[in-house]
Amino acid sequence: MDTILVQRPQFEKAATSAAGIGIAICFLLSQNTLLSAKDLGNLTGISPTLNYVQEQQRHQETIFEESITQKYGSSNVVEVEKGVKYVRMIRFYKNKPVRINIVEMSLGVNQGLAVEPAIASETLASRNKISNIAGRDNAIVAINGGYFKPQTGVPLGTLMINKKVYTGPIYDRVAMGIFDNGFEMARVQLKANVVTNKGGLKIDNINQPRMLSTNTIVYTPDWGEYSPPSPKYGKQLVISGGKLIKTSYGRSQIPKDGFVIVGPQKSLDTIANARKFKLDIKINPEWKDVNHIISGGPYLVKNGDIYVDMTAQKLASIGGRNPRTAIGYTKDNSLIMLTADGRE
């Protein structure tokens, strides 16, 4: 990954305390940063345009600084990097302290920054400390990302990294799309099919634990070396190079150049005699030019208003006093990352 690590020791305590993380959200400082406006002016001599760019950047810096001051006042604010602020505060809930860490980032102030999810290891079924993930990917800031299965580390919910879909949504939960110049949030649905010369087969999910015995799920090499067991009365089709190479009723080795379809035998038999197989994956909404997607939930704020929909996203069971992570963005596309630790 073409990035530069900018170390900030004040984040080590928060990072190393979170073990067993399946996904992390990282800030990366891109090594492919464009020349500054000042440098370009010396080389090209197009000063009117560059002066305008410089003025625009200074204006964005002013807005960002004023916003931070207005929101956090006398709180402990540290500049991590140009356009990145770290805020520490303590608030009290039911007479007990809640330690809050907040990072705000403005892409408009520092275009050399990038935001992207990162998985714990080469495969989805793995766990790692945030500090290890951040160090590996040269991140200047990192927090734990979406939900994951504690036993294996497999992400639970939508995950796309660099336009590649790793996992599909669970219960159409809310996810954040990360673009070159901003962010969007929406509840996400999967539209996936296995397309063959004998017709198509609807896919219920990708690289996710089975929710129902009637679901048909595709497992790619990102899942790991082997697919999970088949459901009762189920079977597996092993696809390599676009062709069916094996039919199995138990776990199957996932080809590096293919995938394994796992589902009810009755459903898979409809395409078992096909000669050509292709996996077609679409995400709804079809965000144009989205680079990354990471799922979470529930909503906390929507369109500027408090909007907590735990029941609608089937998250009512996670209530109670626990450490929490939140991510969001402002109307001027500044990113907000927050952790709250108030269990003690």
Label for each model-derived stretch:
Residues 1-11:
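N-terminal secretory signal peptides that target proteins for export/translocation
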Residues 3, 16-22, 26, 30-344:
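Gly/Ser/Thr/Pro-rich low-complexity, intrinsically disordered segments
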